[in-house]
């Protein structure tokens, strides 16, 4: 384990369970992002801090992997650690252990820091915080998307409604996974939970605007792409477990 890390304990909320009682992959991303924000706040980097420094943190891409998908009501421990900014990207790894101390999930998130005044990516933050960063974080997940350019199937159109948007006024990063699962044929998601996901965020979809979503089988899973005003908004690759069809009683 790297020397600088932050630990947060959670209970999987009922509202974050799917039809089988398992935690939705989008919920994992929300819990992970909350732990990252709490980590920063514990070192004095709150909303006011970022406003005063004229910067914003955005997620560029992220991946998650489940060894076992937890059920609603389970008590979990999230351990998150961040690597020093390299070429404008901050790697943050979050691991999840269950009540028995077994690691059941990992998330690899790549954050970017943007100057609000000049609207460009900063290669290094204009401050230092002792005890927050690690020189390196060894663990990582594959971030490949296994893109498909042909034979894409149109799933439909999604509106960035109130329930999908966050304080920034556009679709929340985690909810793109819900959209991706909604876009796929129901038989696919019924067969088993998501065990791996890689997602890239290209352009935001503002509140009230629409996005077309397309999908295609790819490698061992499914490739999805969302387009807003003719430009790519997000791309995603999902893999599902085959056979974990039992429900939590």
Q: Language-model segments: which ranges?
A:
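Hot-dog-fold acyl-thioester-processing enzymes
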Residues: 1-59, 106, 114-195
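HotDog/MaoC-like acyl-thioester-processing domains
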Residues: 3-8, 63-146, 205-207, 216-249
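Short coil-to-beta-strand transition motifs
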Residues: 74-75, 150-154, 209-210
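Acidic/His-leaning functional-site neighborhoods
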Residues: 158-238, 246
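Short, positively charged
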Residues: 47-48, 55, 73-76, 92-94, ...
